[in-house]
Amino acid sequence: MKEGPISSSSNFNHIPVMGKEIIRSLKELPSELTKKGLIIDATIGGGGHSAQILENFPGIKIIGLDQDPMAIKAASKKLIKFGTRIEIISTNFADFSHHEQAICVLADLGVSSHQLDEPSRGFSFRLNGPIDMRMNPKEGSSAAELIETLSEQNLADLIYELGEEKRSRRIARKIKNDLAENGPYSGTQDLSYAIAGCFPPKQRYGRIHPSTRTFQALRIAVNNELGSLESLLLKAPNWLLENGLFMVMSFHSLEDRRVKSSFKTDNRLKVLSKKPIRASPEEIELNPRSKSAKLRISAKKFLT
């Protein structure tokens, strides 16, 4: 499938979710850590969280990671004023290895506002574009290729397991029948229309769009998001100094359950937020995306 044009990096100027809560947590660290410590921003995106941290802590340095070329471009432009205090690396956090210990590892999971708002990326069912959904448009198979190659059974299982969609069998059957009879879908809205047709009319206009869970499942599969998260949860504690913070922000239950379980069972970590931190009503009003966010924080234990 041909890729659509990639938009300007300026669209990454979104509001970082729960920025105040992250800064507040960092300020609770011992001052000797925040005076000259290193932070690993595992999902730098447009650089919003990193910019806030660098502005609030003049002695801190950040290594920022991202696999999206447009995010790298946007973050580099936004953070250039911080000079050598910021280093940006083009990589998936699952592939990152590091030896210098950090005072914090921060991960803001999932798809960004920019990626949702840019039709050419193919993440949105509201804006028509190619059925792509790759975080890195230059690597791996697109969502269109995925639905083409999977069997109906495997597609149904994927939609059920990664999207928690109860109508997964009906949706998979519809998609595979359409592909067999009419060839590839013309774009994301064409696919979304087919998915919506698997729901009773009264359920097509509810609070949650009929395509939400299926699009989520395809995006997670295309980018191996849960596999990458499992890798991060395993490796990140080794990057931390004693008392260093591991902060993970998730936007759906599949991610949050894994983060919660890992923090609870990992003997390298002490859970600091027994319940997830949620965005304030004021933030949700300004930034509706923050409503589904859950921030969990743990600290590196001293291991003898």
UniProtKB/Swiss-Prot annotation:
GO MF assignments: rRNA (cytosine-N4-)-methyltransferase activity
Keywords (A to Z) from UniProt: Cytoplasm, Methyltransferase, rRNA processing, S-adenosyl-L-methionine, Transferase
Subcellular location, principal: cytoplasm
Pfam families cross-referenced by the UniProt entry: Methyltransf_5
Disulfide bonds, paired cysteine numbers: none
Family stated for the protein in its record: Belongs to the methyltransferase superfamily. RsmH family.
Protein name as catalogued: Ribosomal RNA small subunit methyltransferase H
